[in-house]
Structures are given as structure tokens and as C-alpha cells.
Amino acid sequence: MRLPLILALSLAIVPLGRALAQAPPTPALPAGTATPPMAPAAPLAGTGDFHIVWEVKDRFRLFRNDADFLRLAAASRGDGVLAAEDRLERATDGLGWAKDVVANLCLDNFGNLEETCERDGVRENYLTPIDHPIGVTISGPAPQDASCVWSFDSGNGPSQQTTVPCDQEVKLRVPSGRTTVASVDIPLGDGTAQRVSTEIAVRDVLVAGLGDSIAAGEGNPDKAVELDGGFCFKRFLSGGFSQYFRPSRAGYDDDRSCENGPSSPTAARDWDRHGARWMNPACHRSLYSYQVRTMLALAIEQPHLAVTLVPLACTGATIGAGMFAGQRADDCPWVVGIETCSGTAPAQFTELRDVMAAVHRQDPKRNLDMVLLTIGANDVNFAGLVANVIVDATTERILLKQGGAIASVDDATKSLEGDLPDEFSQLRTALKPFVGGNLDRVVFVSYPNPAMQAQDKPCPGGRDGLDVHPAFGADAERLRAAAQFVETKFLPGIRALATCEGNKACRNPTTDGMTFVDGHQAEFVQHGMCVRASSDPEFDRNCFLTNGNSFQTDPNAAPDNPMACGEPPSDYKPYAPRARWIRTANDSYFTAMTYPEGMPAILKPSDIHDALWGVLSAVYGGAVHPTAEGYAAMADAAVPAVRGVLGLQAPPAVQA
């Protein structure tokens, strides 16, 4: 592991306006949007209206480029993550902002953290930076055309001095874990000068993100799949097979028909190349996740903070297979020169131990400040509950039952009340060493109920939003029972386990209880997967029909355009604002089109034309997960809890 060789302050004087003007172009945001201003520091000396203002640059350290951070900060007006997400979605015409950022993260080609990362031209140790970039300026009516004399003393050598125009920002790097005193002599109109000083101390918080698909951001690839004309699927039935067409991945040039037998390995690789892109493909980690959005929001609102996020959450994780042991990979990334992947993802606790070992090799005193966590749904086989509700056809239900992919409410209840308490006990024991023995530094963000359209009113069932596969159709009674289980048993049960309510398998409730977040659940009640509004995207209103007849059945017309409405599939806007905050099966296919990897042999599709993968793609690949707006609402609920754990104050605009 290589460390940056910057052992002293390095000065770069850049006018603030010019520095921002050099950022890459970005889609225009609504009028009135502005980057949050730098926060003033309380002066140590001096009088009058002058004070020193400073901020950490590129303070969300997962980003390589400060320009990316500034673009996202510009969408924030202090009114929450959801409001900012709405502005970003409109500014990008519903195509998403993360597609322009995902290639510029401190991650390798497989989505794993790089210990050494080049950020804005400087190689840094991602986990243990020795210094931080900051910008310093003067707030107050400085004389025009005057020059100010700055000095910076970090206590490890001679102070650094520079003379610049008073209206210019001074950019420099200050040592980590050390206070730097900044002073400036400001000329006054009477020929004298006023000295103003302040202390600069960057706080760098180290946060791990753990858990399952809800923690990872499933359903929302950083770059959504691009769509075009029809692609043939062959559905095997008891008496033979049938064919139907759905949108293809744009750019896929191999055979789209079902007439020429199984697809070749070359065709499969070409199919992979044109899939969605994820921050981490094996685990479907996404920049849209509530964990990323929470810590990004904190970095935006706290100018003196640097945020070092370690994202480890993984779709499909259970406490046993995912946290303590490895699990199947959700996807296999296509990387030039690598033709195969292992089909597995490592245990999150193993990864976290490796991360902290790397941290302590460089800085034995640096520890985790906090853990973000969501886990437990897969332990009660929530995906099996989803399959039980939406898979209506006999052939597919039999196959999924044989593969263990169907679960009833009774099955889920037995797991919730039987095995899960002991598993949570093991989870608490494993987490404690990472957070100093007290689990109040673990922020557990709970699940939303995905199947509600209003208070005490579950979605009605049917094929609305589910007709991407002929086998889908939500059974109304099974849906009602599942929604009731989530509302009355699962969510209260998870809360009790996380917080030690009723001493649920907690040896010491004072140290075993986690900080719990569920404020978003009330908001999701009116934004379930069946909710529609006149403000929904035009494609949704015209082409996703409530009667379940969204797709072309004419075998002559479907290869060119599989949509019954006649509009091209490419008009679908994966990240446009919607009334529903839960992805439907249609949304999942049109946004991610996940080809599932690591499945049991009985459930493994024969090739890319096998309609079985369409079932698995919905059940395991994003359906019944929050949209980007839903994850943003979860982040809004989490931010106050995170501030409390880290001992941070809300900015004045939020307090007001």
C-alpha cells in the first residue's frame, strides 16, 4: 500500500469563481439552486465584520472528483435528500445522475475499495488519509483590489505564508488529526491592517455500510440498462413451450429470436456487456442506496467533515450467508480480459475485518465511528414471500417450490419467531468489537412496507406492473396476507430485535440496543408498488396498462416493438419522479434487467432466451425494492439519527 508523499502544507491559490467554473458541464438545475456556502469558523482574534470561512474539498471521499460532489451539492437546498433527488431526476430527464459518477469512484473494476486512490490528481490512502484538501476565504467587506497576507501553522514546522488578492480562495492540504491555525492580515482603508485567525481541524468519520439488498440499493443500477426492440423468450410449459417478446438490451447485436437454439458463449458475453452498471455488480451496490445518500447528505451539510464510507452491503445477504459467510453473487461483472467470475461474494464481516486491519496498519488509533445496517428480510425468506404473491402460473410455481424459492406467511413467521432472535444475538456479538462494545453506534434503518396504497389499505393485486412475464399476477388474498404480516409481525419484530424491546435475546440492553430508524415507514404507506398518479411519467401512463395488457401479442409486430402502446421502450425513464416508491416487476426489468447468477441448478436458466430468468430477475433482481426516491426518503429519516450518533449539529437552515 502506497501513501501520499505530502508531509507538509501545499498551497494552490485559485479564485473561487474560477475553480467552480472549471467543473465539467452538468445538466441545468432549477433556478435558485446553489451550492451550500462554506461555514464560518468562530474567530480566535480580530474585530469588525471579517471572519475566516473554510470547507473541506471533495469531502465525500468515495468520489475521485470534487466536481461530482459539487454537482450533487448544487441540488441541495437544505430541504432534504428526497427534494434533492427530485431536482436531480428532473435535471437528467429521468435518466439518473449516478451514471456520470460511477466510473469515478475509489473502486476497482469489480466494485471493491482501492486502498490508494487518486483524487483530484493526488494519490491518497482512502482509509487513512494523512491530509485533507480545504478551501479558505474571507467573509466580509474586504477592500477592492487589496492583497491579504495568509499564514497557516500546523505545528509541524515553519508556517506557510502567501499573499493573494483578498477576494480569492486559498486552497491547501492540512494534516489529518492535527489542528492548523489560519491567520490573515486584511488591509483597511486607513492604511492599517486587521488580523483574523481561526483554528482548522478536519474531522474524518469512518463509516461502514452493511446489510442486504435494501442496504445495497437494489433495484437502482447506477447506469440503467438501455432498451430497444423486441427480444424473444421461450417459456417452457407442461405440454411444450410458447414464445413472447419483451424489450432487448440496446446494442445487443446477436440473435434476438428463439429460432436458432441456445445462444452461444459469444452472444452471452455480448449480452453481459450491454447490461446495467452497478457500483459493485456482484452485490448490486448502488450510489442510490440510502447508505450512500445518507452519508453524502451529511458531507454536503457539514463543511468541516470528511466522510470515508466503506460500502459492503450485498443483495441476498442473510445474517448467516452474507454477514458471517460468503453468499452467491447477484451478478457477474463483465471485465475486459476476464471471461468468468466466481459467482460468490465474500462475507461482510470478513471484509470489514480486512478493512480495519488495513486501517490499523497505518493508524492504530483510527476506529469505526459508526455502522449503517439493514438485515433480516432474507432470513425470513422475503424473496420467497414475493414469489408466492406474484408468481401465479402453475408451472413456474412448481419449479420455484422445488428450488426453495417460494415461502408462505407461515414459513416466514416461523423464521421470524424461531431462528432470527438467535441470529441477531450472534450479529450483536460480532458487531460489538467494531464499535467499541456499544451498539448505539450501529444505526439500523428498517424496511418499508412495499404493498400499501393508503393507511390500512394494501394494494389490490392483479397484473398491474407485473405483466412483463406471463407467469406474473399478484393474488389478492396472498398479497393482503403478506402485507399484513409485514405490518403487524415483521416490522415490529425487527424493531424489537434491533432495539432489545422486551429484552429480545439481549444480554445487556444498555449496550446491545441499536439506534433505530423507521420514520420513513409512514411515508411509504401512500407510495406502494401499486400507486399511480397523473404526474407519473408519460410512458408509464400510456404503456404500463392497469389491465395487464402492456405488451404486444402479435408475433409479427412484437420483434420490432414489444409495447402494445406503440411507444419505443427507450422512452421509459428509470429515474423520473413517480407516485410509487417501490419498483414493480416491470420497473425492475426496464431498469436493471438482471440475469441472475449463482442460482441452484434447478433454477438456472438454460440460456438468455429461457423465460425462467425473467421470473428470477423480478424475484431476485429489484422488484419490490425502493426506487431512488424511496431510498432518498429513507436517507431523510436516517440523517437525524446519524447526526445524533456522531454528535453533529444540524445546519442552521435545517434547524429553522
What does each model-found stretch correspond to?
Residues 449-499, 503-624:
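Mobile gating loops/cap/lid regions near enzyme active sites that modulate substrate access
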Residues 230-415:
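Conserved SGNH/GDSL esterase-like catalytic core that processes O-acyl groups on lipids
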Residues 4-15:
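Bacterial N-terminal signal peptides
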